[in-house]
Amino acid sequence: MIIAVTSSFFAPVSTAIKTEPTVDAAEFSSTQSAVPAARLARLRHGINLSHWFAQSADYSRVHLESHTTAEDIDLIRKIGFDHVRLTLEPAPLFNPQDPAKLNAEYLEYLDNALDLILAQGLAVIVDIHPTDEFKLRLNSNGQIEAFTKFWRALAQHLSARDPDHLFLEVINEPMVQDGYRWLGIQGKLISAIRSGAPQHTIIASGHRWSGIPELLFLLPYADRNIIYNFHFYEPFAFTHQGATWAGPNVSFYKNVPYPSSPESISRIVDTVQDESARRNLLRYGEERWNAARIDREIGVAAAWAAKYQVPLTCNEFGTYRSFAPAADRVVWIRDMRTALEKYRIGWAMWEYAGGFAVVNKKNGHATPDAEVVKALGLVVKK
């Protein structure tokens, strides 16, 4: 069933946590959040809209006007999602010679997409979601300055939209390896966004892949209109089995079960010929991943948020469906959603359509995966 929206959903959880490293800088603070409760309530259960304005080799007019349609947005609402996270590749908007000057034609396509989403009563996170190549440029101070100018201009453009329904996410998984450096970079970007959009809520994350370890390294910024965020794809051996882009081990895996145990893994380990991948899979079995383990992991993130009295979301989690046992994938999604809601953490699943999808899409028509929708605690409206 659909759980009623209440402002207490994001209430702090009283849980102890070890002290993180400190940074002596005025831009950091431990003051309570000033994010309006109504905004938090709109980010309870969402879905990622990927491969539309990001992760595509084609940003042509035909692609942008046909990849995701009004029918898709209507279905997202009917499934019971309250918001979407719109992934946005900055490169088509970005002018290296004049970063503050946005591509007007492409900006119009983005505006049309936002109009489509907001017209359905959904909230939307505009997530800057660059390629790895673009993100690696953040190792250069000059590129940081250019990106800062870009974000200020984009934020100013988006500031005309209702701040109760549109949220601005600094960047997806920045890949900056140095956590201290990322604290400074993100602080600079937050200042730029805030100067362009004084009223809008900003979403900030940790360095590298923005997981829980990176979240724990973060110190809240002095800007109190920020929601903090993390991604969760553990255990990776299960959620990314068969994914050729995700590292040297998981590409060898198929039919990896969840929950895990030495006994369940023993039934498939002989199908893996690569020695390193075999050892990694055996370790996954020994780790005994299940609902209780996921609950403990999410509890650590919740404790960090409680310590600093800041709101927290998880706007990426999911399982690659090509090789995972379908029933086990449903169990993992249910366990994740249950843990997040236990700790009053708003969520957005990865993704609407694609390898991790909540729908099956054929010939432009999408059909919800009934078991996944149920695992998310949602009910499709007629």
What are these regions (language model features)?
Residues 23, 35, 145-288, 295, ...:
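Active-site region of glycoside hydrolase catalytic domains
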Residues 17-38:
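Mature N-terminal, pre-catalytic/accessory segment of carbohydrate-active enzymes
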